[in-house]
UniProtKB/Swiss-Prot annotation:
InterPro entries attached to this UniProt entry: ST7
Transmembrane segments: 15-35, 472-492
Residue ranges with Gly residues bias: 85-99
Protein name: Protein ST7 homolog
Assigned protein family: Belongs to the ST7 family.
Keywords, in A-Z order: Membrane, Transmembrane, Transmembrane helix
Domain of life (superkingdom): Eukaryota
Principal subcellular localization: membrane
Pfam families xref list: ST7
Keyword check for Hydrolase: no
GO cellular component labels: membrane
Keyword Metal-binding applies: no
Length: 537
């Protein structure tokens, strides 16, 4: 019979050093890989493998049948979900929103994809973003964000009828050019060829103008040119597909210029003029309107005018279950309800007598807004630093929260007590959402793709807000502990070989003692010769 004591006595300290060193090395490699995988994908690799591969293999055919049924239901619902998402947000570039993955709930229904939308309140590159760069030497926009804008501009401002028109071919290249000075130079070249090239004026207003007043002046010139081109193409739009495409392009150019002019009026303090222009634009029907979300510009202007009754009317029209939600819609609804009770709200009094009906309605509106986008309160309460918003946003993501808070923080400050009410109640939302990635309360579960998309949209110097806050998986903690313990054992064995050898033998003796005791008890209860007697029978 194998003698364990003889085996242990023959082991040298070098064996223990090699054993613990090898174990420490393997544990360290596993730890590094787990940490890298967690940082990139937000989950543990070992946990994913055990859940997705080992568990179904252990469960057998039942797990496989459930998996096949689940995939069938999700694929059948995926087509309808993608078609609905396309209608709501459009395709990449052409409709101003690009898909970046989808998620499937535990019930088999597919949630809408994470889409990147144009920021309705995007700033001017020359008059605003460029001045930030001069002041801080930090790039406020990412290449990914600017590339999406280039795709949008190509889709909005070009068409098949531009073939063999040198000025429009120059502008097609200009939108894709990374160097801003080269883009401006190309726009001037296009205007030298054709003084009625409206897209060239748009580029100059966006990037060459160093003030809002300069941008407004260029856009007014562009508006005159765009109206002339619009009337020309309107008269010939029925002469074929190419003529119809040119008319759509001229319509997009005209609406875009009017929108930017209204935004200039808003920035220059001409609020009534801006509100009228935004109202007129919301009555337009072309497909570009679903991308620009001009009603959000109108809401922000009305809040600046403190025309709260008009804001109520806009929300009644756009805060509908069939329309895509936004932080502007949800948080403006919460602000208007908070306005009725915020000035008299006191958490101490409310804890004693309870919430009134109006206060309960305001708190529920805040919880609804926080569920839609949980990143906004940190910026409104100024616990996190604001930066310039990107040109594109991800709904329910940190980019949308930045864009909303950048323009709406002052509106919350104008309403006395609104920020205090938000501060006292917003964290209560998370008690209703213990598993926000799996089940929502009023909206779909929170999408898991927001963090990756926001990192592409937001500059590197900004710390992206993550929800829900990720905790280190058990496997990473376990591997880190195992690696540390084995490394310490290897070091101690190398420094003190004989004491560590005695310690190892003592530990093994302690571990084997219960089994030895159990063996003796069994032998006392069940004699060894019993089996021999049974075999004779």
């Amino acid at each position: 019979m194998w003698d364990s004591s003889m085996f242990l006595s023959t082991l040298t300290p070098k064996f223990y050093v090699a054993l613990t060193g090898t174990s420490s090395l393997i544990s360290g490699l596993i730890l590094i890989f787990e940490w890298w995988y967690f940082r990139k994908y937000g989950t543990s690799f070992i946990e994913q493998v055990s859940i997705n591969h080992i568990s179904p293999w252990i469960n057998g055919s039942d797990g496989q049948s459930e998996s096949s049924n689940g995939s069938g239901s999700s694929s059948s619902s995926g087509s309808s979900s993608s078609s609905n998402g396309g209608a709501g947000g459009g395709g990449s570039g052409g409709a101003g929103a690009s898909g970046s993955g989808s998620a499937t709930t535990s019930t088999g229904t597919q949630m809408p994809e994470c889409k990147v939308w144009r920021n309705p309140l995007n700033l001017f590159r020359g008059a605003e973003y460029q001045r930030f760069f001069w002041a801080t030497s930090k790039e406020p926009l990412t290449y990914y964000d600017m590339n999406l804008s280039a795709q949008d501009h190509q889709t909005f401002f070009t068409c098949e009828g531009d073939a063999r028109k040198e000025e429009y071919e120059i502008m097609q290249t200009a939108w894709r050019e990374r160097n801003p000075m080269q883009r401006i130079k190309s726009a001037h070249s296009a205007l030298e060829i054709n003084a009625e090239c409206a897209p060239a004026y748009i580029l100059l207003a966006e990037e060459e103008a160093m003030t809002i007043m300069e941008a407004e002046k260029i856009l007014k010139t562009a508006l005159k040119v765009a109206e002339i081109n619009y009337r020309k193409s309107q008269a010939t739009q029925h002469q074929g597909a190419i003529a119809d495409g040119m008319h759509r392009r001229d319509t997009n150019v005209l609406i875009y210029i009017k929108r930017r002019l209204a935004m200039c009026a808003r920035k220059l303090g001409k609020l009534k003029e801006a509100a009228k222009m935004f109202r007129d634009l919301t009555k337009e029907i072309p497909s570009i309107m679903s991308v620009l979300n001009i009603h959000e510009n109108l809401i922000e202007t009305l809040l600046e005018m403190q025309a709260y009754a008009d804001c109520h009317a806009i929300l009644a029209k756009y805060d509908d279950i069939s329309l895509p939600k936004s932080a502007t819609i949800c948080y403006t609804a919460a602000l208007l309800k908070a306005r009725a009770v915020a000035d008299k709200f006191s958490p101490d009094i409310a804890s004693k007598r309870g919430l009134s009906q109006a206060e309960m309605s305001a708190v529920e509106a805040i919880h609804r807004a926080v569920e839609f986008n949980p990143h906004v309160p940190k910026y409104l309460l100024e616990t996190k630093r604001l930066i310039l918003p990107p040109e594109h946003i991800l709904k329910r993501g940190d980019s949308e929260a930045l864009a909303y808070a950048f323009f709406h923080l002052k509106h919350w400050k104008q309403v006395e007590g609104a920020l205090n009410l938000l501060h006292c109640t917003w964290e209560g939302t998370f008690r209703m959402l213990p598993y926000p990635l799996e089940r929502g309360h009023l909206f779909y579960p929170y999408p898991t793709c927001t963090e990756c998309a926001d990192r592409e949209l937001l500059p590197a110097f900004h710390e992206v807000s993550v929800y829900p806050k990720k905790e280190l998986p058990f496997f990473i903690l376990f591997t880190a502990g195992l690696c540390s313990i084995t490394a310490l054992l290897a070091l101690a064995t190398h420094q003190y070989p004989e004491p560590m050898g005695h310690l190892a033998q003592t530990v093994l003796t302690w571990i084997s003692y219960p089994f030895q005791l159990l063996k003796e008890r069994i032998e006392a209860f069940w004699p060894c010769n019993l089996l021999q007697q049974l075999s004779r029978v």
